[in-house]
Amino acid sequence: MDPLLLGSVGVLVLAVTLIIWRLLKLQWDEKAARQRTDMLLAMNEGAGGSDERRGANVAGGMRRNARRRVNRDEQEDGFVNHMMNDGEDVEDLDGGAEQFEYDEDGKKIGKRKAAKLQAKEEKRQMREYEVREREERKRREEEREKKRDEERAKEEADEKAEEERLRKEREEKERKEHEEYLAMKASFAIEEEGTDAIEGEEAENLIRDFVDYVKTNKVVNIDELSSHFGLKSEDAVNRLQHFIEEGLVQGVMDDRGKFIYISDEEFAAVAKFINQRGRVSIHEIAEQSNRLIRLETPSAAE
C-alpha cells in the first residue's frame, strides 16, 4: 500500500479524534459551570432568608441589612449573570482563578471560543493538506504520463531504426545476389574460336545443369566434369570453387581429384553428432561422417 495514503488516513483519524475530544470536553465544562451556578444561586437564596429573619427582630438593623443585602445581591447577581453568559470563565468551587486560553496575539479568550478557533484551524489545515495531496497526485500522474510518452517515443524510434536496418540489409542482399548472378553468368560465358560468348538464358541453363550434375552424381570426378561441359580441368575446378563460395553447392575436394557433394541434411547430421558428443577427435568425426554422408548416387544405391 502507498505509504503516503497510509499517512493521510492516519492524519485524518487523528484530526477526527481530536475534534471529538474537544467537543466532549466542552460539554463537560458547560455541565460543571451550570452546577457551580446552581450552587451559587442556592447560596444566595439562603443568605437572603437569614437577613429577612434578622430584619423582623431588629427594625434598625433591618435597614442596614437590607442595604447590605441589596449591594451583595447586586454583586452576586452580576457575578451569576457573568457566569451564565460565559460558561467558560467561572471560578472553581474552591475559590481558584478563572480558566482562560490565549490566542496567537496573546489575548485572553474563553475555552469555547478557543475550541471553535482550534476546530476551524484544524479544518483549514485539513483543507490545505487535501489541496497539497491533490496537487502531489496530479504531479505524479503527469510525471508518469510524461515517462510513458517518452517510452512510446523511444519504442517508435527503435522500430523505425529496426525497419531501416532491415531495409538496408534486404537491399544489400539483393545487390549481392544480383552481383553473384552476374558473376556466375560471366563464368559460363564460354568463348570459342569464331563464336560469340554464351549469354542470357543459355548461360543460366548451363549454371543450373552444372549444379544439378554435381548434386546428382554426389561424387564427381573433375576430369569427367570438365569433359561433360567441354571445359578444361582447371576451369572446371575454378568454377566449382566459385559455386562453393556462392553457396550453390557444398562439399569437399579430395586429393584424388574428386569432389564429394554434401547436402544440407548430411551437414546437419554431422553437426548434431558433434553437439551431442561435445569434445570429439578428428578420427571420430571422419568415422561418423563416413557413416552419415552418402557417397553413392540415388540410382546406384537402389
From Swiss-Prot:
It is found in: Endoplasmic reticulum membrane. Residues 101-178 are annotated as: Disordered. Pfam families: DDRGK (PF09756). Gene3D superfamilies: Winged helix-like DNA-binding domain superfamily/Winged helix DNA-binding domain (1.10.10.10). One of its GO terms (molecular function) is ubiquitin-like protein ligase binding. Residues 22-302 are cytoplasmic. The chain crosses the membrane at residues 1-21. GO terms for cellular component: endoplasmic reticulum membrane; nucleus. It is a single-pass membrane protein. It comes from the Eukaryota. Belongs to the DDRGK1 family. This is DDRGK domain-containing protein 1. The gene is ufbp-1.
